[in-house]
């Protein structure tokens, strides 16, 4: 069989780029395939693809989405970006496929993440197979798929646990105002229903979601995760994907000075902004709780999910509390999350439950306080608290605010009352995740079988 050539297309956001690149590397390493990674110029300009230039069989195809600096200011910008993303992406992919048709390595298959749902149309024009790379858990896919069938009046879906409204991905919630995002997911599900033998690649592992990977009878889900840096499965600290030494010395030295499992790590990722009221409640909870913490707070304005009417950065929002906060813990604008989570001093991860962060908590065996914000995060929080039992989830008040007392309750539960149970469960998932993700593990085998099934 000739060397397969995959054209992998992803949206230019860090949460899409990272797992997609890691899948590309797994695909190359396990099968010897060639991968062309296609995305927008902003990914290159914002240095979102470090340390991949020397990967054999991996090349890049970039095109403009009209926002090459990556700065998105308002809702209109988002819509304009998506229009240019599709128009320019369609042309770039088509030109690339045509240029390689008669060469040594013609494109064999297109792989795409959520948002470039136009990729299958390109594949069909050239009579090529296309496969979706789902970068959220299988559980979230099951919810979206069942919802798309019109079975959404009561949240009781076949082969899934009972769901409350608070467990749904935010784009399916009755209070959702982002109809464009909901339409994107509906479009993907509708396309998959048209396929004769639909197959999707999922950033999960077999032992983590066995029932959810088989919950939809007519769709084959292939577990290819956890899509995290390879070094995380070996315990190596040499990989450049794990740390930036020149930036990490201050917080690593601070962590080194703390006792084992005593520090709360707080991070809400790069996409979502906390309201001023919410950040004040969180700050007060950390101050009054008195436990050492490491809190990542960005000083950037260009969040994907910005709070309307609030112009301050998050770091500006805590200005009035900063002195009190720094008497108890440490505030940084960036850290290597994996480096932090694997540190012996970390006892708890207060997380927004983004899927990459959720996987990292599992692979590194760290219990969590689940503080979901949007997208798939509420579903992920349900998994962490109720299914895998590695964390405690916060509850909002009637106004949608998580009060300081509730935050303190959850932190104390994870650090004290339920710490033994949660840590035992976390260690179990750490072992299973490492077995799946290491070289030659179940996910490597699944990737090999996937490629063989295509050709």
Curated annotation (Swiss-Prot):
Pathway: Plant hormone metabolism; auxin conjugation. Belongs to the UDP-glycosyltransferase family. One of its GO terms (molecular function) is indole-3-acetate beta-glucosyltransferase activity. It comes from Arabidopsis thaliana. PANTHER family: GLUCOSYL/GLUCURONOSYL TRANSFERASES, UDP-GLYCOSYLTRANSFERASE 75B2. An anthocyanidin binds at residue 16. Keywords: Glycosyltransferase, Transferase. GO terms for cellular component: Golgi apparatus. This is UDP-glycosyltransferase 75B2. It comes from the Eukaryota.
């Amino acid at each position: 069989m000739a060397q397969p050539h995959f054209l992998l297309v992803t949206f230019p956001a860090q949460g899409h780029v990272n797992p997609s690149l890691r899948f590309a590397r797994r695909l190359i390493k396990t099968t010897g395939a060639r991968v062309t990674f296609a995305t927008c110029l902003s990914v290159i300009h914002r240095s979102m693809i470090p340390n991949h230039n020397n990967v054999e069989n991996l090349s890049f195809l970039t095109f403009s989405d009209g926002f090459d600096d990556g700065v998105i200011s308002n809702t209109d910008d988002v819509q304009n970006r998506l229009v240019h993303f599709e128009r320019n992406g369609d042309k770039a992919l088509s030109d690339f496929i045509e240029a390689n048709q008669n060469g040594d390595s013609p494109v064999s298959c297109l792989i795409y993440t959520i948002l470039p749902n136009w990729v299958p149309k390109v594949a069909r024009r050239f009579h090529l197979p296309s496969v979706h790379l789902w970068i959220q858990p299988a559980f979230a896919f099951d919810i979206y798929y069942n919802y798309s069938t019109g079975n959404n009046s009561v949240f009781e879906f076949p082969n899934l646990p009972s769901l409350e409204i608070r467990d749904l991905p935010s784009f399916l919630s009755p209070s959702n105002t982002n109809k464009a995002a909901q339409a994107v997911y509906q479009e993907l599900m509708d396309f998959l229903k048209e396929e004769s033998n639909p197959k999707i690649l999922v950033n999960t592992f077999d032992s983590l979601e066995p029932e959810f990977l088989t919950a939809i009878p007519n769709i084959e889900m292939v577990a290819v995760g956890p899509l995290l840096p390879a070094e995380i499965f070996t315990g190596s600290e040499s990989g450049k994907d794990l740390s930036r030494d020149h930036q990490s010395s201050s917080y690593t030295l601070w962590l080194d000075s703390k006792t084992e499992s005593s520090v709360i790590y707080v991070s809400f990722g790069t996409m979502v902004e906390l309201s001023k009221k919410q950040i004040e409640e969180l700050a007060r909870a950390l101050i009054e709780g008195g436990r050492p913490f490491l809190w990542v707070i960005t000083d950037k304005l260009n969040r994907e999910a910005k709070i309307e009417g609030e112009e301050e950065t998050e770091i500006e929002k805590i200005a009035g509390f900063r002195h009190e906060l720094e008497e108890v813990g440490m505030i940084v604008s960036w850290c290597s999350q994996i480096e932090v989570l694997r540190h012996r001093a970390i006892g708890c991860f207060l997380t927004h439950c983004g899927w990459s962060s959720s996987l990292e908590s599992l692979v590194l065996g760290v219990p969590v306080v689940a503080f979901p914000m949007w997208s798939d995060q509420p579903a992920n929080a349900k998994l962490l608290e109720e299914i895998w039992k590695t964390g405690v989830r916060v509850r909002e008040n009637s106004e949608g605010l998580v009060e300081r007392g509730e935050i303190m309750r959850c932190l104390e539960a994870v650090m004290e009352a339920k710490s033994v149970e949660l840590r035992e469960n976390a260690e179990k998932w750490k072992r299973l995740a490492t077995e799946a993700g290491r070289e030659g593990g179940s996910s490597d085998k699944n990737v090999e079988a996937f490629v063989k099934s295509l050709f």
